Amino acid sequence: MVNILLVEDNPDDVKITERALKKGKVLNNLYVARDGQEALDFIYNKGEYTDPQKAPKPGLILLDINLPKVNGIDVLKKVKSDEKLRRIPVIMLTVSKRDEDIIRSYDLGVNSYIIKPVEFDKFVETIKNIELYWLLTNISPTE
């Protein structure tokens, strides 16, 4: 079973992602952080997430860019610069089509950059495709 951390402040996008992953082919534990600081607390077991049983190391991070408190770019930078975390696949799942966001994300080591579809069915299909590739097709280091 894989642990997925969804970092998303839009409650509708959280619900759609949860539903798509529940209907998917891979058993997963989905954890949700509603802002960048909460994501960092979860990843580093700080604040309300000091218990690693309640906040296990994610096997995949779905990360929005435009987040309250700490933005997604800064979360990505911290994760990818940490020797113990840098191999965790991080997927930017965002509405931002700005070239500077895309370039900066790849420069910092993002594994994939996906623009969130506006239509419900396409959003669900995108989440299912992420699951199929990153959790079934892709081979990640076991460490």
Please give the residue ranges for each predicted region.
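The feature encodes the CheY-like receiver
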Residues: 68, 86, 98
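Two-component/phosphorelay signaling modules centered on CheY-like receiver
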Residues: 11-38
